Amino acid sequence: WNWMDQLVTFGHSLPEHEMGIVDCALWDLFGRTVNLPVSVIMGGARKKVKAYASSFPNIGKPDDYAEHALQCKRQGYKAYKVHAYICWDPHKWEPAPQQPGFPKEDVEVCRAVREAVGDDMVLMLDPFGVYTLEESIWVGRQLEDLDYYWLEHPMIETRSESYRRLTDALDIPILAPEHIPGGVFTRAEWILHKASDMLRIDHNFGGITACQKMVAICQAYGLKCEMHGGGWANSQILGATTEAVCEYFERGLLRPGFDYETPPPYLEAICDPLDDDGNVILPTGPGLGMELNWDYINDNLVKDQGMILKI
């Protein structure tokens, strides 16, 4: 891991997300070799984790978000995260650059959702980093009145000083950073400078090994960290941590009419089946726990210079 990290940091010859892929693959290989889930190898703290429903952006009007949140509540979810109105790039799955946020409209959505689901559902907002500092403070104060749990990643993350000022100005916890590179080292600096109240961690930034380190740092400082996104690797990390440190599994993105429960054709099952109480049942198979559909994969191989490998 340290060797790969030096390639990322000094040589720039290995992209950080590719380092994460390699690290996760090595953990998967280790787990399959000893016939244990990675989460058990790392300590095995739990077999299920509370889930929150994470919405797609731009679902519709505030009433559409409210109805979707109610549907999720009826399905068993105890928490719901709003991704509201964003100038969205559908090809990159990220906000289009240099486009404004819509803080007033976002708050209308947040208010409609709270009124619909009542006081017994945990709610969060993620504006995808499109607000200014002034907008973030204003939205945060509205969310405090609506009893939202956290405000996630409201501004771009290249200016940690803006985040420090934001955390000073608000009582609602700020969850960040989400996308800034640097993995464990960047996030340690954010804790040191009090730029966020809760840490966002992700296997894409250094893999499972880096997430282990980030969890340990949060434990040392008495802070919570939350996994960004779902997936097999994040499932294993959550299985190795307690609810006191990493509370939720992010399940989504979800929208009305979207089939989340059917696995893609190259997999035998999804990684995050939901029970009736709104918990994700974590994988129990060896390694990362995924089972590949080799019949589908072999039937859909792409020929390369006349040679293909069948498993």
Which residue stretches match the model-derived regions?
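Metal- or metallocofactor-binding catalytic centers and their adjacent structured scaffolds
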Residues: W1-T33
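Conserved, mostly hydrophobic/aromatic
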Residues: V22, N35, Y80, D126, ...
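Short amphipathic alpha-helices and their capping/turn segments at secondary-structure boundaries
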Residues: A25, F30, A66-R74, G289
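A generic structural signal for well-ordered alpha-helical segments
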Residues: F30-G31, C72, V117, T167, ...
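Metal-dependent enolase-superfamily TIM-barrel catalytic cores that perform enediolate-based chemistry
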Residues: K48-V49, A53-R164
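Shared catalytic-loop signature of beta/alpha-barrel
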Residues: R141, D147, T158-N279, P283-P286
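Extended hydrophobic packing segments that form well-structured cores
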Residues: P286-I311
